[in-house]
């Protein structure tokens, strides 16, 4: 719980074309791993639709009810978003996901202009989200001051 400083991008680590539902994530995170809550605040589906998984507001703070278990050590100040796909370290984002990912991030930065965007693979030795978030953010016009280029592991 604290000031909202980061948006972290994740992948579901599933094959290209496989949709992932909220129910799938509940099964994987809560039932199988025993987590107390989901790992993500929202998911971009294959058709580009963004589904809120854990409700959040735009007040610049991560409240206890907004916390998700996306990356150990980062959850108290980070909003975690995931896209369906990314299995085997392959960027499988659809054109629809790409378009709405950009729109979602621009909207989040409108409400929280000091937030930085980062990939899960920048805070853990994983390949998730299967693409270079910093580089992609540059190509879609995210201001450099909103891109976290660091490696934290």
Put a short name on every predicted segment.
Residues 1-37, 43-46, 68:
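Cell wall/extracellular polymer interaction/catalysis modules
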Residues 63-72:
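Short, charged beta->alpha transition segments
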Residues 1-12, 16, 46-57, 61, ...:
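Basic/polar, cationic surfaces and motifs that engage anionic cell-wall
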């Amino acid at each position: 719980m604290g000031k909202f400083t980061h948006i972290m991008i994740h992948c579901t680590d599933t094959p290209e074309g496989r949709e992932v539902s909220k129910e799938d994530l509940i099964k994987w995170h809560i039932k199988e791993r025993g987590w107390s809550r989901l790992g993500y605040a929202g998911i971009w589906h294959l058709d580009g639709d963004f589904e809120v998984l854990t409700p959040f507001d735009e007040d610049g703070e991560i409240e206890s009810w907004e916390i998700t278990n996306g990356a150990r050590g980062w959850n108290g100040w980070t909003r975690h978003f995931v896209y369906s796909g990314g299995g085997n370290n392959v960027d499988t984002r659809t054109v629809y996901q790409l378009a709405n990912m950009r729109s979602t991030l621009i909207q989040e930065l409108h409400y929280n202009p000091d937030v930085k965007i980062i990939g899960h693979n920048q805070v853990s030795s994983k390949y998730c989200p299967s693409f270079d978030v910093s580089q992609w953010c540059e190509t879609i016009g995210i201001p450099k001051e909103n891109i976290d280029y660091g490696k934290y592991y």
